C-alpha cells in the first residue's frame, strides 16, 4: 500500500429537498386544503478517525465527495426522505485544514472520533405552511437549502511515542526490527526507508509506539532528500532516539547535520528530549568507541550510549530509558 500523508479534496453537503405544492384530493370534496409536505434534510459530511487505516491513499485518486440530497416533499403532507450523511474515515493523527492550508479545523488525536465539517441543507417548506385566513389555497413553497461546499487539506501526522532519527543508513530500520515486530525494508545503502515505519515495543508489561523516520540529509528542511516530507511525523513524539553511524569518519558532523535540520524545521522539534546512540559499535574496537563517545559528549553535553543493532548490544537499555521518559511525560 502506498503511504500518502497529504491530500487536497473537495467536499459538499447534500442539498435540502424542495417543499411541495399540493392540495388534498378526495371524493366528494371539491376544494381540499393545501397538503404539500416539506423537503427532506440533506446529508452532512462527517469525518471519522479509524485506527485500522494508516494512510490517506483512499483520497489520492478520488478527490470529490458529496453527501446525498434530501428528497422533495410530497402530497398528503408527506415529507421528503432525508439524504444519507457521508462518513469519510481517516487515520488517527489526521489534521483537517482550510483550503489555503492556514487554518486548522480539526485534529484527530484519538480513535473513533467524529467531526461534522458540513451540515446538510434544510428542507424547503410545503405549501401547507402558507395557508392563512385570507389565502386558503396557497400556491407557494420554498426550495431546499443549498449545502456548503469547500476544498480542504488533509494532513497526516503519525502518532508515535518515540521517533527514530539519524542520517541515511544509520541503522534506524534495523533498530526498529530488533525492538518490534515491524519488518521494514533493510539494506546497506542510503534511503532504504522511503516512508515512515511504525512498530509497537512491548516491555515489562508496557508498550509504546516507535516510528522510523526516513533518513535526513543536509538541507532536508528545505526539501532536499526525504526528510522535509516526514519531519512533521516526529512533532507528536515524546522522545527522539538519535542514531549515529559509529563507522562514520566524522560522527560530530553527522550529529550536527541532523540537529540543524530539526532546529531549522521548528523550535518544537529543537526542544524534544533526545537519546543519543552511537550505533554499529560491533565494528569498532573499544578505543575507537570511547574516543567517538567522548567527542560527541563534549559537543552535545549529553550522555552518549554505545549500541549495536547487529548483535543487540545496549538496545534493551535504550528501550527501557525511552519507556521511562514516556511515562514521566504522560503522568
Curated annotation (Swiss-Prot):
It is found in: Cytoplasm. Its cofactor is Mg(2+). One of its GO terms (molecular function) is GTP binding. InterPro entries: G_OBG (IPR031167), GTP-bd (IPR006073), GTP-bd_Obg/CgtA (IPR014100), GTP1_OBG_dom (IPR006169), GTP1_OBG_dom_sf (IPR036726), OBG_GTPase (IPR045086), P-loop_NTPase (IPR027417). Keywords: Cytoplasm, GTP-binding, Hydrolase, Magnesium, Metal-binding, Nucleotide-binding. It comes from the Bacteria. Gene3D superfamilies: GTP1/OBG domain (2.70.210.12), P-loop containing nucleotide triphosphate hydrolases (3.40.50.300). One of its GO terms (biological process) is ribosome biogenesis. This is GTPase Obg. It comes from Rickettsia prowazekii (strain Madrid E).
